[in-house]
Swiss-Prot record:
This is Biogenesis of lysosome-related organelles complex 1 subunit VAB2. It comes from Saccharomyces cerevisiae (strain ATCC 204508 / S288c). Component of the biogenesis of lysosome-related organelles complex-1 (BLOC-1) involved in endosomal cargo sorting. Component of the biogenesis of lysosome-related organelles complex-1 (BLOC-1) composed of at least BLI1, BLS1, CNL1, KXD1, SNN1 and VAB2. Interacts with VAC8. Belongs to the VAB2 family.
Length: 282
């Protein structure tokens, strides 16, 4: 039986045909592959030595990235600190304002606080009204005194006229007088009518030399300085009218200086007599 089995196997082997590897294409491709490296080159040290420059570059890149990131973090930290300081200052201001508002609300929240504020406002308004009334009284007194003094002067010597040079010198005063008491301002037409209606007595007499005038004024001044007894007001006016200053036909521009060209005879005599009366009263 064993002999029969061996015979059968041999017959089967004789029938099978094997293909050789050397004649296949795969074997040719296997031959084309490079040979394996040595085991010394496959160690860890050999592998890291071959990539040493790449490792150094990666290390440098990591360090530079770390520096940039750390710098950005420091800047952000500084900015956060500054913002925190500003927020603290703002918080202090807000707390201070809040405390002030609380105080104001506590002082004005109740009825007594509002009444106190109203009373203070009424006191201030009352004091302002009193001061305004005092100012109005003072101004009215000044205007009354000014108009009274102007009315006592002769018509030619009066200062409150529309055509007077004082209008240019004191525009605010004349504007105020026009608004407050327009009757105190003498119009130009009214003044001319009054002058034509009452001519000056100086035109009825002849002219006198200047020496007599100077001697007359010099004697009067000496008498006033020595405080001699004077006559009454009517006698003084009559005695002054007896000696009259000459007429001057020359004209000149407007002037504020007192001279014989811009002072009328009536105003001059009236002023002299008024001075004498004031000296006699004192």
């Amino acid at each position: 039986m064993v002999a029969d089995l061996t015979k059968g196997i041999l017959k089967w082997k004789s029938r099978i045909e094997f293909d050789a590897v050397g004649s296949s294409s795969y074997y040719e491709e296997l031959k084309g592959l490079p040979p394996l490296a040595s085991h010394k080159k496959l160690t860890q040290a050999a592998i890291f030595n071959s990539t040493k420059y790449e490792l150094l570059q990666v290390k440098k890149d990591i360090l530079s990235i770390y520096e940039v990131v750390s710098r950005d973090i420091d800047e952000e930290r500084n900015q956060m600190q500054q913002i925190e300081l500003q927020l603290k200052k703002s918080l202090k201001k807000v707390e201070h304002s809040y405390k002030n508002v609380l105080k104001q609300r506590a002082s004005t929240n109740c009825i007594n606080g509002n009444d106190r504020l109203l009373a203070n406002a009424e006191k201030k308004i009352g004091s302002l009204n009193e001061e305004l009334a005092c100012v109005n009284d003072i101004v009215s007194d000044i205007v009354n005194n000014l108009t009274a003094l102007n009315a006592n002067l002769p018509k030619k010597a009066q200062l409150l006229k529309d055509d007077s040079i004082n209008v240019a010198h004191y525009p605010l005063l004349f504007d105020f007088l026009h608004k407050s008491c327009p009757k105190s301002i003498i119009a130009t037409s009214e003044a001319s009518i009054h002058e034509n209606a009452s001519p000056s007595p100086l035109l009825e007499h002849d002219e006198l030399p200047a020496e007599s005038i100077n001697s007359f004024y010099g004697e009067n001044e000496l008498q006033s300085d020595s405080l001699a007894p004077l006559q009454t007001h009517d006698d003084n006016i009559s005695s002054c009218k007896k000696i009259l200053p000459p007429k001057f036909n020359t004209t000149s521009g407007p002037s504020i200086e007192t001279n014989f060209e811009n002072i009328s005879a009536d105003g001059l005599t009236y002023t002299k007599c008024s001075l004498k009366n004031s000296i006699s009263l004192t």
